[in-house]
Amino acid sequence: MIERGKFRSLTLINWNGFFARTFDLDELVTTLSGGNGAGKSTTMAAFVTALIPDLTLLHFRNTTEAGATSGSRDKGLHGKLKAGVCYSMLDTINSRHQRVVVGVRLQQVAGRDRKVDIKPFAIQGLPMSVQPTQLVTETLNERQARVLPLNELKDKLEAMEGVQFKQFNSITDYHSLMFDLGIIARRLRSASDRSKFYRLIEASLYGGISSAITRSLRDYLLPENSGVRKAFQDMEAALRENRMTLEAIRVTQSDRDLFKHLISEATNYVAADYMRHANERRVHLDKALEFRRELHTSRQQLAAEQYKHVDMARELAEHNGAEGDLEADYQAASDHLNLVQTALRQQEKIERYEVDLDELQIRLEEQNEVVAEAIERQEENEARAEAAELEVDELKSQLADYQQALDVQQTRAIQYNQAIAALNRAKELCHLPDLTADSAAEWLETFQAKELEATEKMLSLEQKMSMAQTAHSQFEQAYQLVVAINGPLARNEAWDVARELLREGVDQRHLAEQVQPLRMRLSELEQRLREQQEAERLLADFCKRQGKNFDIDELEALHQELEARIASLSDSVSNAREERMALRQEQEQLQSRIQSLMQRAPVWLAAQNSLNQLSEQCGEEFSSSQDVTEYLQQLLEREREAIVERDEVGARKNAVDEEIERLSQPGGSEDQRLNALAERFGGVLLSEIYDDVSLEDAPYFSALYGPSRHAIVVPDLSQVTEHLEGLTDCPEDLYLIEGDPQSFDDSVFSVDELEKAVVVKIADRQWRYSRFPEVPLFGRAARESRIESLHAEREVLSERFATLSFDVQKTQRLHQAFSRFIGSHLAVAFESDPEAEIRQLNSRRVELERALSNHENDNQQQRIQFEQAKEGVTALNRILPRLNLLADDSLADRVDEIRERLDEAQEAARFVQQFGNQLAKLEPIVSVLQSDPEQFEQLKEDYAYSQQMQRDARQQAFALTEVVQRRAHFSYSDSAEMLSGNSDLNEKLRERLEQAEAERTRAREALRGHAAQLSQYNQVLASLKSSYDTKKELLNDLQRELQDIGVRADSGAEERARIRRDELHAQLSNNRSRRNQLEKALTFCEAEMDNLTRKLRKLERDYFEMREQVVTAKAGWCAVMRMVKDNGVERRLHRRELAYLSADDLRSMSDKALGALRLAVADNEHLRDVLRMSEDPKRPERKIQFFVAVYQHLRERIRQDIIRTDDPVEAIEQMEIELSRLTEELTSREQKLAISSRSVANIIRKTIQREQNRIRMLNQGLQNVSFGQVNSVRLNVNVRETHAMLLDVLSEQHEQHQDLFNSNRLTFSEALAKLYQRLNPQIDMGQRTPQTIGEELLDYRNYLEMEVEVNRGSDGWLRAESGALSTGEAIGTGMSILVMVVQSWEDESRRLRGKDISPCRLLFLDEAARLDARSIATLFELCERLQMQLIIAAPENISPEKGTTYKLVRKVFQNTEHVHVVGLRGFAPQLPETLLGRDEAPSQAS
């Protein structure tokens, strides 16, 4: 059989109150229970939205909208969502066992229209282990998760192998996939189909009779023309008797259900409370013992924590004292590092300034040379300018003289004049007023000798000047170097100081070379000193931890002793660990074994109960599974024999029934064809003529006529001949006797009567011998006698058949019980008792726990000793390598000595660094300081004076030479007057004058340019001197600041300072870390002590309270046990499998049973009062009284004429067997009565008959549905009279209207419309065309009228309208109609989808509190019979006993609203298979 698809779960993501909630849907009924606003309607709205994601249809009304012409703007969906991405998903499993997840992504659209965006999607191939919430959420941390958008969901699913994700752009495609996969019952091709589907769901959701559906039932229930199907003959008359019988069975079944309900619920109610009290008593005893153990353990823990607190407080005080010293040392180290870094920066500046000073010194020297060269060039330019001036003056004078010389006289005259001028100039220059031309030669020799002497003197001075200038510059340079190194001093002291400085420089340079070795040595010694101090600190700490002072010589022996102790303790700890592991492993194995036994115990107990029941039913004792299988084989053999005997009796009974039916025919005809032939031939049956024969004569006449006793007596055989031609519908042998039926006698035969026989002489050569029959059937009296005997035999056979059927049913039920036992319990039924083993294991577990506790205490002590020894060895491992340091007492003195030497070397290094360059420059020129060139200025003046004297002597000699040369010109005195101008000479002189003036101008410009350049050179020199002086001053300031800092600024000083600071920082950090750890541990220890103190007080209080409670409860429990044993109900109540359930589960089980019992005994005053009294939780014995009262009540109600037992449980089993037998018998009878109808000629009539039969089949499923006063619901389908007349004319009188159908101008539809108008002229067709009317007439649905009727109370059958029914009745009736519609859709769509698909079937019901318990139960039975899932929303006062119930409570926590959901499985037992078979029988027969 194809399994029906089921909705597995509904998942809501980010809905109002539901962030990520999955509701597992029951296979039948899922109940959403909760108060107003709990979220029931929101859950159903999410389901409907995923089923029909059409915003044009979705409208979740609210009761506050009553009377409003339009709903809220968002139609109830926008407000049910939260901001962001939301999902609603349905997890389904179809008939092919394919898992399909369909759903929609919803998101609020911003704006005042409050719109919602919906995107449908489907997921196929998803593994069963993957939950829907895992797909659409991503966990961020333990308390946060986010909802994945649709694109991320698609990427996530595409990454999973075998999983298909489909997103739909149209709702039609979405619904098409759902139809093909068997999720919805009908293919929704258009918006109209979706609207019908939504109206169906909406009517189901809000309950009641939907006018939208009832007005258009034909559209919902009747499919379109889909071909011709066979029709079935109306079985109403044949089924009426069965229904009446089944009604009687239902009445009896109600008693059976009441018995079963009362027993099961009373047993659950009392047994759950009984076992809960038993469990609680055991739990209280265990808790009291556990409290006592915990009290002892907590006292020990408190003492240990107090000791620990004292130790940690002492250590914390020590660390607090050491932290101040470490902070001071660390601050000092940080300040020292800052000073070193500052000194290094100062040293870098000093080096940089010294480099700059060296560069400035070089540039200054170069600039001095440049200035000196510029001065020399300036002097040359001045001399050149002066010579140019002299030449211009001379040319001007010559031009003036030569202007008068026009001829030779003029030349002589000019010469004369020049000679006179030269003589005058010579007088002037030589200071010889008496000089004459004649004496000039004498004076020339004198002045030439004087010039030579002046020249020699000048050259000598020039040589001295050059040498003095060189010595003067070296002396100044050496003197400045000495001043720079030593400071101001007298010039005469420079030589001695310079020699002393050079000797000191050699010594300082030698010391400076020792800086690096000394620094390395100091660093090494300081490191050893720190290690020595660290070793001393470690030794002091070790002695403090050991509580004893040790000498250095004792440490190695102590180390060996501790290592030996560690080795021994390590072995002990190792062995203890192995022993503890073995104990824990055994404990875990015991615990695992106990858990497995506790899980197996309920199964074993259930198997034992089942085995005991089987033993009681069959009266056998079974000791092994082989006994069970052997007995099952015997049972099968007995069942086979009983079935064979029952079938034989049934066959005989059927034969008797057929014979009675045959003998009951009027006229005694055993063949109906004989009556028809007799009527056709105009004769009478021979059996009718002899119908009044007596019972005594009946054997004679039966033997007399023999086979011809069924003959037909006709008046004339000749008239029959023509009828015999072609006769086929007759018996194989047909006897005809000619005679008068009114006066017929037996004279037609020649007869000889014998004893109990006759001989009939048929002809001369043919006789017939016939004996008298033992059971004559000739004549009415014989037949009646036979019928009477057959009835008696039939009664015997019926009773025997019933007995055999009962035995078969009982054997089958026993066989089924054995089969269930073999399938469920055989594997564990004959195993050892797990409870006995659990008791043994628990005792062993207690021993192990005690051993583990003792072992842990011993191991803890060893571990503490091991840790102490290990810490000691660790400390010694750090101390022993430093023993030589601890023994070195002179290390600190050596460090101080090396530090002093390093200071001296560093001072020397600073001296060398500061004055090394000056000393290097001073060393090669120090000898110039021996003599001071003080006469350099006088020499310089003498040199200038000798230059001037040499120049004057040269001019005097030149002037005298010129006079001597012009001595002849003096004789031209007479030609002076005769001078005349010579223009040519004049012009030449003028040209030379212009050239001389141009040269003079150039000389002047060059002099001015060079003067400006000289001025620039002097400015640059002054700037360089100023920069040099400034830099020098800054360098001196920096050197003074470096000396003021007082820190050695060498290359490794910063690294040593940083290492020292980091070491102190590490020590300070470690100290602080340890101090913080101790503070935290101390705080934790104090808190732990406080907690232990509070725990001790609470444990003491709980222990005494629990002890008092155990003592108090003992008296009540003894009373309960006494009452249970006195009434013999311990076997019913002491259900050991319930001992393994929790108290909450048992209390829930008892509460559910109590709710069901309140409804069950509502009509019984006695049981109601006893039940009310039993609800007192302080009086558990009253529940036992109620259970005894229920049993007594049921014993009184057992019908002893039907069921012969005093035990209500056995009575229920026998009643189930009897009802199953009756149901099976009536079902088989109904199947025999179902005969096929005659086929009809018209396709419309056949289709109508088919759909009428289908509606009748739907009605059969609703006949037993009752809601309140409504006893039954049915759907009436009638053919309209006008259309029925049209069908009759079409099938039988169509020849009369051939003018319409043979017309070429009319189509068939139009001809059909014309015929309809012709037959019904009184009907106004309106504006519709014949074509439209004809198309409507071709649709068989227009021939039918449908309406829903209910059988309500004394009113009988009436039309189902909401105004005539109560709210609950309207809900139940509307639900019945919807079930019919769903079944109709499935039948219609079966041919469209796969043959192996049976679609899901689910409806809703909101606010189910309007239905009473009987109506709810009816819905449950309807769902079970129709394999339909139902989602019910009900307040908290409804607690269905079947299906799955979700308790919804909406809560607000920290401004966050969420719905708390608790799911409960149904606790009512399932209906037996035979009853389910009875319920399904009508639909199978249909």
UniProtKB/Swiss-Prot annotation:
ATP binds at residues 34-41. GO terms for cellular component: cytoplasm; nucleoid. SUPFAM superfamilies: P-loop containing nucleoside triphosphate hydrolases. Residues 326-418, 444-480, 509-603, 835-923, 977-1115, 1209-1266 form a coiled coil. The keyword Cytoplasm applies. Keywords: ATP-binding, Cell cycle, Cell division, Chromosome partition, Coiled coil, Cytoplasm, DNA condensation, DNA-binding, Nucleotide-binding. It is found in: Cytoplasm, Nucleoid. Belongs to the SMC family. MukB subfamily. NCBIfam families: PRK04863.1. Plays a central role in chromosome condensation, segregation and cell cycle progression. Functions as a homodimer, which is essential for chromosome partition. Involved in negative DNA supercoiling in vivo, and by this means organize and compact chromosomes. May achieve or facilitate chromosome segregation by condensation DNA from both sides of a centrally located replisome during cell division. The hinge domain, which separates the large intramolecular coiled coil regions, allows the homodimerization, forming a V-shaped homodimer. Homodimerization via its hinge domain. Binds to DNA via its C-terminal region. Interacts, and probably forms a ternary complex, with MukE and MukF via its C-terminal region. The complex formation is stimulated by calcium or magnesium. Interacts with tubulin-related protein FtsZ. This is Chromosome partition protein MukB. It comes from Shigella flexneri. The gene is mukB.
